[in-house]
Design a protein with these regions (language model features):
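Cysteine-rich micro-motifs
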Residues: 211-222
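Short glycine-rich phosphate-binding loop at a beta-alpha junction
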Residues: 62-73, 147-149
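Short cysteine-rich clusters marking metal-coordination/redox-active sites
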Residues: 201-204, 217
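Active-site-facing substrate-recognition patch
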Residues: 1-60
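PRPP-dependent phosphoribosyltransferase catalytic core
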Residues: 2-11, 134-197
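Short, glycine/charge-rich flexible loops or terminal/linker lids adjacent to PRPP-binding catalytic cores
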Residues: 78-117, 124-130
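Short metal-coordination and nucleic-acid-contact micro-motifs, chiefly zinc-binding Cys/His arrays
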Residues: 195-200, 213
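Phosphate/pyrophosphate-binding loops at sites that engage ATP/ADP/AMP, CoA/4′-phosphopantetheine
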Residues: 53-64, 133, 137-139
């Protein structure tokens, strides 16, 4: 029987990973894109996300009281973990304080001094994760752990997150490379145009997504 972790990886590779040419929020470009929300907002994917995150938190012995992150990438993860755990409360961090009503930036769980875990879906530059860490500490939470569903190692966001996290460990459930490999395995037999070999596009040198009739990337395929 496949573990929840393996099932989650398989779901991410199938539902959330795409090859092509994409512009990133950092301003750079990439030959792949990951939209975690197609998995974390999926009925089965949400349950798997909650199970995997909660098990990791439990195994690490962080003794957290709540879990939260910057809206909106973290939102479905926070809800999934809260529901699956039955014991961790959730909070959401607004990108800016409300300009009306209570004017608060932290929504949901608001117990100062509480031990909390910060979560995010994809860590690229780490900017959204860092914002959430800073907002949580400014409010009065004790950040005991930081987690992301997928870490894009090529973007080198880990040092930024680790600097902001301080003594709190930063844990990624999967790397983008792991998801990419699983995606290639899933499509190896059913989509011959997508192959796992590290072939380069003969036009621009990017990773090829087809070898029929020539090795080409998404932008230059015939």
């Amino acid at each position: 029987m496949h573990s929840a972790r393996q099932k989650l990886l398989s779901t991410l590779a199938h539902k959330s990973f795409r090859l092509g040419e994409f512009k990133l929020s950092s301003g750079g470009t990439s030959d792949y894109y990951i939209d975690c929300r197609t998995t974390t907002l999926d009925a089965k994917g949400s349950r798997l996300t909650g199970e995997v995150f909660f098990e990791e938190i439990r195994q690490r012995g962080w003794k957290a009281q709540a879990i939260g992150g910057l809206t909106m990438g973290a939102d479905p993860i926070v809800v999934a973990v809260a529901v699956v755990s039955g014991e961790l409360d959730g909070f959401l961090v607004r990108k800016a304080e409300k300009q009306h009503g209570t004017g608060q930036r932290i929504e949901g769980f608001r117990e100062k001094g509480a031990r909390v875990v910060i979560v995010d879906d994809v860590c690229t530059t780490g900017a959204s994760t860092v914002q959430a860490i800073e907002a949580a500490r400014e409010f009065g939470f004790e950040v005991v752990g930081v987690m992301c569903l997928i870490e894009r190692e090529d973007a080198k966001g880990r040092p930024n997150v680790e600097k902001a996290a301080g003594a709190a460990p930063f844990v990624s459930i999967f790397t983008a490379n792991e998801v990419r490999k699983e995606h290639m395995l899933q499509n190896d037999d059913t989509e011959p145009s997508i192959f796992a070999a590290a072939a380069a596009c003969e036009v621009c040198g990017r990773l090829a997504v087809t070898n029929n009739p020539r090795p080409r990337c998404e932008a230059h395929k015939v």
